[in-house]
Amino acid sequence: LEREELELWLKNHNNYELFKGYVKINFLIDLDMDMFDVDDSKKQLLELIDKEKKEYRLRKYVNVFKYAAVVIIFLGIGYLYQLGCFTKTPEVIIPSDSITLKLENGNVEVLSEDGTSQILDANGSVVGSQKGKQLVYDNDNVMEKLVYNTLTVPYGKRFEVKLSDGTKVYLNAGTSLKYPVKFIGGNKRQVFLTGEAFFDVAHDVTHPFIVNMENLNVEVLGTEFNVSAYSEDLTTDVVLIKGSVNLYTNGKTLNEGLRIEPGIKGALNRKLGSITSEAVDTSIYTSWMEGDLVFRNMSFENIVKKLERYYNMKIIIVNKQLNNEIFNATFKDEPPIQDVLNSFGKSYGISHTIKDNAIFIN
């Protein structure tokens, strides 16, 4: 009887339009409206009524909307299946040699070295842009809280980022930098570094700039300096080019730290927790920015670490006696690794073999 009442009720044009509008209004997936078939929905509805057996009878308008609601549910579930909402989304595997940018919402974007793109915040607003090997963040965005991005550069590559305050940071291979999308007035300008980077800090007397590392912090007002803080190294080195910086370890205050001047390298011994300083040729520590490899009084073990990062290749020292041997060498203009290895072979009699994408030093 319910079926007969519904069919009779739907024959009226106004009732039919009312039924159709009810389903569409309550069907929350607007994108599906182009595929919505009212006649098919009516057929499903009538079939459902035929299967249902009731001992009591409700008012006809209540039944109409009750069944319409059931159709809505069926349509919604079917649409969600079409979208894949009930299937497991395949995990996207990012190649290990990719330059990546982790956004505030946890999403990770892959940056092409010759690409151009916009950087968006969680609200879809543009906060910066990429042009080739450089990210540039805007300073005219309105933000009430600190929001961070993390730029990660793999072995074998280098990249640059210009922060919202105008500070320029050059990231060496195997480096990660976490920084605010925009620095907010009243707060210190803080970034977090692992690896190696050169900082050209925009001067701001009222907002000190702090580079936080695992065991060491560097605080400046505006200056140029290089920081090397690779986890596999025994020391964290800060080489000052211009201005002045203060170094202090975690748990210490700024006044308990060490102040260094241009031409000085401050080094934290991670095992001892002590900071020492010495005069150095600063060009040795910034040569990587030009693609050069410069080794001065460096152990072969540390040279190999730099070569692995520079070329993104696994290098195994078979002859362990070489580890502590000291070498001096200079290689200009992004030299091929074969040239570097041949030079060591010619000058020092060190041979090598290549097998399974690894270099063995004999």
Each PLM stretch: what is its role?
Residues L1-K24:
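N-terminal amphipathic alpha-helical interaction or autoinhibitory segments
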Residues E5-L8, L18, Q44, E55-Y56, ...:
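Short, solvent-exposed alpha-helical surface patches in well-structured domains
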Residues W9, Y22, Q44, L48, ...:
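Residues that form generic nucleotide/phosphate-binding pockets
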Residues L28-V64:
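Positively biased amphipathic helices and basic secretion/translocation or surface-docking motifs
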Residues I49-Y67, G76-N362:
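A residue-level detector for the "anchor" residue at the start of short, highly conserved motifs
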